[in-house]
UniProtKB/Swiss-Prot annotation:
Entry keyword Disulfide bond: yes
Identification of the protein by name: Esculentin-1ISb
Tissue: Expressed by the skin glands.
Role: Has antimicrobial activity against Gram-negative bacterium E.coli ATCC 8739 (MIC=3.1 ug), against Gram positive bacteria S.aureus ATCC 6538 (MIC=3.1 ug), methicillin-resistant S.aureus ATCC 43300 (MIC=12.5 ug), B.subtilis ATCC 6633 (MIC=12.5 ug) and against fungus C.albicans ATCC 90028 (MIC=50 ug).
Organism: Odorrana ishikawae
InterPro entries named among the record's database cross-references: Antimicrobial_frog_2, Frog_antimicrobial_propeptide
Keywords per UniProt: Amphibian defense peptide, Antibiotic, Antimicrobial, Cleavage on pair of basic residues, Disulfide bond, Fungicide, Secreted, Signal
Origin organism lineage: Eukaryota, Metazoa, Chordata, Craniata, Vertebrata
Record-annotated disulphide pairs: 78-84
Keyword Secreted: yes
Residues making up the propeptide: 23-36
Gene Ontology CC: one annotated term: extracellular region
Entry similarity comment: Belongs to the frog skin active peptide (FSAP) family. Esculentin subfamily.
Region forming the signal peptide: 1-22
Amino acid sequence: MFTLKKPLLLIVLLGIISLSLCEQERAADEDEGTKIKRRIFSKIGGKAIKNLILKGIKNIGKEVGMDVIRTGIDVAGCKIKGEC
């Protein structure tokens, strides 16, 4: 019985080592895949997001500028008329 335990133990240990190595390789492959996805999305998505933000800032700047001008004209008109 003792002679059967050694080969069985050896097979189990080799199986565990093999499984561990496969899991490490699988994890490395998944990491590479996510890096590639990140690069693709950062190139495509980064430009799109950047353009959206810039357009939004420009539109907000225009609206704020127009509001300031309107307010300034209203205040100036009020002071000229003496109604303030």
